[in-house]
Amino acid sequence: MMRREDEEEEGTMMKAKGDLEMKEEEEISETGELVGPFVSAMPTPMPHNKGTRFSEAWEYFHLAPARAGHHPNQYATCRLCGRQVSRGPGVNVGTTALWKHLKSMHREELEKSGHGQAGQRQDPRPHGPQLPTGIEGNWGRLLEQVGTMALWASQREKEVLRRERAVEWRERAVEKRERALEEVERAILEMKWKVRAEKEACQREKELPAAVHPFHFV
């Protein structure tokens, strides 16, 4: 008899405790503020890496009650509109989704508080190696210079080839002139030889009758 009364009393206490928790959860979803025992669940802004500053997004959010089948830190409640925003599955989740919600729904509030550009410097988790600032411009200028040098080299090579061909043409022209001069000189020598031969023949013809008839004119 006493045991049954104890069990009934314990069941009544458990039911009252459950009703109290449900009431507190309803107050959370309606006002967006934590009350009762959930105040201790107020999230302390967690840095993503040691030595980094706390995210300013937590000025506008607090962790929502855990949902069945989800990580306790997955959902956060917006203090401005009371909506619950998913931060993504897993443990090491950032505040990117929170900043997106603030920028899309409460941009004016962010600008008033001076946090309009704050989301851009949060969650510095690069997916790959960061290139130095301006590296693309430097590469562009370098490629442009290389292209200019290649074009200049190509034009220079064409100019050299053109000059070489011009020199070859001039050399062939000089050779032709030299051969023509040699032919002219040879022709002149032949003419001289012919003229000399003719003179000698004439001279012999003149001397021949005088030798045959020495007293012909006496």
Curated annotation (Swiss-Prot):
Binding residue positions for Zn(2+): C78, C81, H101, H106
The entry's keywords: DNA-binding, Metal-binding, Nucleus, Repressor, Transcription, Transcription regulation, Zinc, Zinc-finger
GO biological process, one term: positive regulation of keratinocyte differentiation
GO cellular component: chromatin; nucleus
Tissues and organs where the protein is expressed, per its UniProt entry: Expressed in keratinocytes.
Keyword Repressor: yes
BED-type zinc finger span: 52-113
Chief location bin: nucleus
Compositionally skewed regions (Basic and acidic residues) per UniProt: 105-114
Bias (Acidic residues): 1-11
GO molecular function: DNA-binding transcription factor activity, RNA polymerase II-specific; DNA-binding transcription repressor activity, RNA polymerase II-specific; RNA polymerase II transcription regulatory region sequence-specific DNA binding; transcription cis-regulatory region binding; zinc ion binding
Biological function: Transcriptional regulator which has intrinsic repressor activity and which competes with the transcriptional activator IRF1 for binding to the 5'-[CA]GAA[AC]C[CT]-3' consensus sequence in gene promoters. May thereby play a role in keratinocyte differentiation.
Protein name listed in UniProt: Zinc finger BED domain-containing protein 2
Organism: Homo sapiens (Human)
Primary gene name: ZBED2
